[in-house]
A protein has these predicted regions:
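Short linear motifs at protein or domain termini
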Residues: 1-77, 193-216
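Short, flexible helix-adjacent loops and helix caps
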Residues: 2-3, 72, 76-80, 99-103, ...
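Short amphipathic alpha-helical segments at helix-loop
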Residues: 6, 49-52, 100-101, 145-149, ...
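Amphipathic alpha-helical repeat elements characteristic of tetratricopeptide repeat
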Residues: 54, 65, 88, 155-159
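Acidic active-site catalytic centers that drive phospho-/nucleotidyl reactions
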Residues: 68, 113, 172
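Conserved amphipathic alpha-helical segments that form helical-bundle/coiled-coil interaction surfaces
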Residues: 81-146, 158-167, 175-185
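C-terminal regulatory/effector modules of DNA-binding transcriptional regulators
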Residues: 146-216
Length: 216
C-alpha cells in the first residue's frame, strides 16, 4: 500500500503489518528522519514527507544538473568501453520490446533510470559526487512518482538518454553536456506538469545512440 504525503506513520500498525516488534520500526523511522526522508514532529510522531513544492523540486533539479554536467566534463574524454556498454545495456532495457511508451511499472523504470544516471556519474570516478547525487535523487524520484501517479515517460526519457550516450560514444563532451542539460530540463518540466506528456524539445543537437537489436 502507498501512504500519501502527510500521512502519519503508526509504528505499532507498521510493526504488525511487517511481523516485527516496534523497536526496529522506530529505529528505522529515526534513521529516515535523520536523512530527511520522513518528517518527525515532536509529541506527534513520524509522517510521510510532504510533496516537494515546485520551487523545491526546481532547486533539486538545478543541483542535479550541476552534478551530472560536472561528471560529464570530468570524465567524458575517457569514459571507458565497459561503462559505455553498461549504459547501452540499460538504455536497451528501458526501451526494449516489452515496454510500451507509457506504462505503470514505475519501480522497474525508476531502477533502470537510476542505474543509467549512476553510470553517467561514474564517469567522474568520484564516490563523493555519486553519494551527493543519490541523496538528491531519492527526493526527485519520490516527487516524480506522486506527481505522475506512477505513470512514467519511457519513450521520451529513452530518447534523451540515447542523445547523452550518442554524444559520449562520439567523444563529443560539449554535445554530451547539452544532452544532459536538455534531459534534466525536460524531466523537470514533465515532473512539474504531473504528466508523461513531453513539454519541451528533445533534440540536443547530436545523433542519438539507439539500440535496435539488443545490447552490444
Amino acid at each position: 500500500n502507498v501512504l500519501p504525503p502527510g500521512d502519519r506513520l503508526n509504528i505499532d500498525a507498521l510493526a504488525e503489518r511487517l511481523g516485527v516488534s516496534p523497536t526496529p520500526i522506530r529505529e528505522g523511522l529515526a534513521r529516515l528522519a535523520a536523512e530527511n526522508l520522513v518528517d518527525f514532529r515532536s509529541y506527534r510522531g513520524y509522517f510521510v514527507k510532504k510533496m516537494l513544492t515546485p520551487q523545491e523540486l526546481t532547486d533539486l533539479f538545478d543541483v542535479r544538473k550541476v552534478l551530472e554536467i560536472h561528471a560529464v566534463r570530468r570524465g567524458a574524454a575517457r569514459p571507458g568501453m565497459s561503462r559505455l556498454v553498461e549504459m547501452e545495456r540499460l538504455l536497451y532495457e528501458m526501451g526494449g520490446p516489452n515496454l510500451e511508451p507509457e506504462f505503470h511499472e514505475y519501480g522497474r523504470f525508476s531502477i533502470l533510470d537510476q542505474r543509467f544516471h549512476e553510470a553517467l556519474l561514474g564517469l567522474a570516478e568520484s564516490p563523493a559526487l555519486l553519494d551527493a547525487w543519490r541523496a538528491l535523487n531519492v527526493h526527485v524520484a519520490a516527487s516524480r512518482f506522486f506527481r505522475s501517479s506512477g505513470l512514467v515517460d519511457v519513450q521520451h526519457s529513452v530518447t534523451e538518454h540515447a542523445a547523452i550516450l550518442g554524444a559520449l560514444v562520439a567523444g563529443d563532451t560539449d554535445a554530451a553536456v547539452r544532452a544532459v542539460d536538455v534531459h534534466i530540463d525536460a524531466g523537470l518540466r514533465r515532473s512539474l506538469a504531473g504528466s508523461p506528456t513531453p513539454v519541451g524539445p528533445l533534440d540536443a543537437g547530436v545523433e542519438p545512440f539507439v539500440p535496435n537489436e539488443g545490447p552490444m
